[in-house]
Amino acid sequence: SNDVIFFEDMFQPGIESLPYIIQQSPEQYRPRIYLRCLAQAIDPDDFVHVWGMSRWMSLYEQMCNEIPNVHILATNEEMVAHMRIANWKAPIYNISGLSYGKAEVLERVKKIKPFEQRARRVGFAARWDQEKQPGFFMDLIEHWHANKTLPSVEFAIFCGGPLRSNNPVYVNRAKMMEQAGALKIYENLKKNDYYELLNDTRVLFNCALQDWVSNTVSEADTLGCNVLFPAYRSFPETFANDETRMYVPWSGRDAMEKLKTLLSKPSPNMGRISDWTDGTIDRMIDIMTGIGEQWRRDGRHYRNTVSESKY
């Protein structure tokens, strides 16, 4: 069949009915199934290990691999490698990014604020959970404030609801630091409020152990905000190996040195990350229509493309 069923997320309730139905259908009526993979039980830093969910989730992944006519859309090269290690037999493609609409984000702000007019603010937009290493961020803040030769900076946490964590130690420490004037917590932000803050922020900072291609990096890059992420996991691929916007994991010294530069001027590569992720949906459609075979990664030479800049 030329029909295609696409699942935006492989971990979708109801997907377990597919193999039961397809297996009973004649071959000529079987659609091709495309599953986009956003997370994996093999990831040692994923929250599924915190909550003990990995035992059943790895079995669920095996089921997905056995669905007739299934094709896997991985979001980066490292995720592909994990699937190959696990001996997945389904065709695997690297779509190299999350689904993202740059124009939709730009429509939510009236005008991009010039960099030099922005508040000297460093934002943190990941979950405040232990796998995002909020302790590393708070350590960096304390070291920054302790060095009196460094400029005054507002360090901020951006939250869509109240600040919460899978480890309350991080919430307690953050609130104590806010009381001391070391950081500011922005809570219960609507999407447009968050974008307005990004549009008045100079650097978005990330130090996550568990993160693949985060939409926060595309949003900040779209709205004229510098981004500083660890050279870890999929971020070298996302950043096209741009060493000026990535720091050595987990060097606080290197992060602070890069942060000083990114607070002072916009990156010359600003906008390129979001331009690339803006094309992710097109790459998926190319794959599903048979013209994206350059993204296939289940052959012998699948690791040859890891170090190549994607744009």
PLM feature segments, named:
Residues 111-143, 156:
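Conserved donor-binding/catalytic core segment of Leloir-type glycosyltransferases
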Residues 250-253, 257, 261-311:
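A charged, aromatic-enriched C-terminal amphipathic alpha-helix characteristic of glycosyltransferases
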Residues 4-9, 23-47, 73, 95:
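Active-site proximal beta-strand in glycosyltransferases
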Residues 67-111:
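Donor nucleotide-sugar binding/catalytic pocket of nucleotide-sugar-dependent glycosyltransferases
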Residues 50-72:
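Membrane-proximal helix-turn-helix segments that form the acceptor-binding/catalytic region
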Residues 208-210:
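Aromatic "clamp/platform" in nucleotide-sugar-dependent glycosyltransferases that forms part
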Residues 153-171, 187:
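Glycosyltransferase donor-sugar binding loop
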Residues 226-229:
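Short hydrophobic beta-strand element within catalytic cores of glycosyltransferases
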